């Protein structure tokens, strides 16, 4: 794992000397968060077969991770100054352990619902603890370190995808869940007995924040965030079910997409220095639409090429939207950013069961038309992707309008928005 070397740097006054160790712990905890996304995506079919639950029910199970995340993020953000990052990190550890153990010993649908909620809550707790902690530990290079921290979300998805792809058959889904206990225990060891930084956050004017939430630009982005999250997660979280019969390895597709996202975000500044945030969002929506269309029409090796286009589309969605709000509606403050990230994750609580229903209906229709086995699965997967394409297509229109509206306003370079420290406050900023 790469951690920015600071051995020759002077640690600022008031910052604990063990900040490198805490930063490493934060990165490992984010890897656990990402692995839960990747491995869950890889075992959905097996969970359905093991517990005899439908695609709609699998959608509800999936949605619990996206519900637990914003709940923890909002609660953690509200109590951070009172309890500090140490207690939030231990809350994340306990929730991760509970979620993983309860998943292994789940007896059916409701067991999976409860265990997946705990995992989502743990993931949100990691974000609530680590982002402000890193800001407090590295006041001299906040952007740089937050950027490197959040690379480990797509990086962790690559790790989880490869583990599931190469070891899933031999270990089974329970074995894959147990593997995630290894990095979970590692980050607990790294934080045990350590001194944590004191919060140096300035208390914002909450009344002004609430007024900022009524800004038309903020409300516009609030609506768009639900669609950008759906564009990304509706495909990546259902990749195994949708692309399983396409002739490509679904988890390798997920690893490819996540690897490109990590690389793209790591080098975000030089790549898109000349573009403004609205332009980045518009181009991203166009590429995402093309990518999902290609995924719904291609098979075999062409799926990997289609995945590259899709990855380029979703790469900058989330962090650029958070950066846009930070730059153009600053009055909304940290509250606005927290709610924006929360609605992005919460939207998948709504959409996951819907997508499961689409997949189930398409499979039934294909079977009724005479298709069987892999052929029926392929037809159903393609039809489901063709329904999902409406998410980014709507964004093409919305972000196109935003681009022309913003042309006559003072612009902020896209790299400033993408790499803004405040824009890194959710995992979406690195997903």
Please place each PLM-identified region on the residue numbering:
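Cytoplasmic helix-loop-helix junction between adjacent transmembrane helices
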Residues: 115-151
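Residue-level signature of mid-helix packing/kink "hotspots" within the transmembrane helices
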Residues: 38, 66-74, 158, 258-266, ...
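Helix-loop-helix hairpin linking two adjacent transmembrane segments in secondary transporters
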Residues: 140-141, 145-199
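Extracytoplasmic
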Residues: 21-55, 235-240, 351-355
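Extracytoplasmic gate region of multi-pass secondary transporters
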Residues: 40-41, 214-263, 349-356
């Amino acid at each position: 794992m790469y951690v920015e070397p600071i051995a020759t740097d002077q640690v600022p006054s008031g910052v604990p000397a063990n900040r490198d160790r805490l930063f490493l712990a934060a990165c490992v905890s984010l890897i656990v968060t990402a692995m839960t996304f990747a491995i869950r995506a890889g075992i959905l079919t097996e969970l359905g077969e093991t517990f005899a639950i439908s695609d709609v029910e699998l959608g509800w199970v999936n949605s619990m991770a996206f519900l637990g995340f914003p709940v923890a993020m909002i609660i953690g953000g509200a109590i951070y100054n009172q309890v500090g990052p140490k207690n939030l990190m231990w809350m994340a550890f306990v929730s991760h352990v509970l979620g993983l153990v309860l998943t292994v010993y789940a007896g059916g649908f409701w067991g999976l619902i409860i265990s997946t909620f705990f995992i989502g809550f743990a993931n949100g707790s990691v974000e609530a603890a680590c982002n402000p902690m890193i800001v407090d530990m590295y006041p001299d290079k906040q952007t740089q370190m937050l950027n490197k921290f959040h690379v480990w979300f797509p990086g962790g998805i690559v790790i989880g995808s490869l583990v599931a792809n190469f070891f899933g058959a031999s270990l089974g889904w329970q074995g894959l869940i147990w593997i995630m206990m290894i990095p979970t225990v590692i980050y607990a060891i790294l934080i045990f007995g350590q001194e944590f930084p004191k919060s140096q956050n300035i208390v914002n004017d909450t009344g002004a924040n609430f007024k900022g939430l009524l800004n038309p630009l903020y409300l516009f982005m609030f609506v768009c965030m639900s669609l950008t999250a759906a564009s990304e997660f509706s495909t990546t979280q259902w990749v195994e079910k949708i692309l399983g019969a396409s002739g490509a390895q679904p988890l390798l597709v997920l690893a490819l997409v996540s690897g490109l996202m990590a690389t793209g975000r790591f080098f975000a500044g030089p790549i898109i220095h000349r573009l403004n945030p609205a332009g980045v969002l518009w181009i991203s929506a166009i590429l995402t639409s093309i990518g999902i269309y290609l995924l719904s029409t291609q098979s075999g090796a062409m799926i990997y090429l289609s995945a590259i286009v899709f990855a380029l589309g979703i790469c900058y969605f989330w962090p650029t939207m958070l950066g846009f709000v930070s730059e153009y509606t600053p009055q909304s403050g940290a509250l606005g950013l927290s709610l924006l990230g929360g609605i992005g994750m919460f939207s998948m609580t709504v959409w996951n069961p819907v997508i499961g229903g689409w997949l189930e209906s398409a499979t039934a229709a294909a079977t009724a038309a005479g298709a069987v086995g892999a052929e029926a699965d392929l037809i159903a997967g393609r039809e489901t992707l063709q329904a999902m394409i409406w998410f980014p297509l709507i964004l093409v229109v919305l972000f196109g309008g935003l681009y022309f509206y913003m042309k006559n306003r003072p612009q902020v370079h896209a790299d400033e928005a993408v790499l803004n420290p405040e824009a890194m406050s959710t995992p979406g900023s690195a997903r």
